[in-house]
Amino acid sequence: MPQIYFNGPEGRIEGRYAKATSPNAPIALVLHPHPLYEGNMNNKVVYNAYKILVDNGYTVLRINFRGVGGSQGKFDNGVGEVVDAGAALDWLQQNNPNAQSNLILGFSFGAWIAMQLVMRRPEINHFLAISPPVNTIHKYDFSFLAPCPIPGFILQGDNDSIVSADDVKDLVNRLSNQQSHIKIDYKIINGADHFFRYKTEEFSKAINDYLITIQSNYHHHNNINEDKSKNQKKLFLY
């Protein structure tokens, strides 16, 4: 999992990158929590999510936002951080032109950034929002998801003292009711706090289960397309 640097809008951006063996492996970008509260790409939740994605065959990049670790610049209240995430996704795509799909995962503040990028980048196929900061003291607004264009997974602990589980549930309900064909999966881990302390096994299983689901759906969709293609060829031959 080598350390990398690439050019961002405010100078270099630092990241950790793990490339899958398959050239068409799906790619995933992982975003960390609030930089002013010691959030960085080595946060335990971020690292564990990164490792789970790697273990599931993804090519994965996690980054430090501007002003964090080896990334240049300074905190920009979420505005510049969205641009950083976009630059990171550009880098991932340029280095993996045959990737079969694009996924973005964010934890806490990183989830807010991730969801904004979802609205800007139509090539993103799935999102994972871990402990999204709905109605916190920072008043992060998720109303820009109108509607949410892609399916995703929201993971929350019921003992979260930073983000109310009820507020997250309200967000899930709102997103789920926007478009009937867009499925928003939601799971609460009992006893888990904002950082899923002492709940690593349950945390890992929840993400693993979701990744398995979307991969099986992807293969099912591909098989249907292959069958259609075969039928079209038969019709042409006859």
Curated annotation (Swiss-Prot):
GO MF annotation terms: hydrolase activity
A Pfam family: Peptidase_S15
SUPFAM superfamilies recorded: alpha/beta-Hydrolases
Protein name as it appears in the record: Uncharacterized protein RP471
Source organism (scientific name): Rickettsia prowazekii (strain Madrid E)
Lineage: Bacteria, Pseudomonadati, Pseudomonadota, Alphaproteobacteria, Rickettsiales
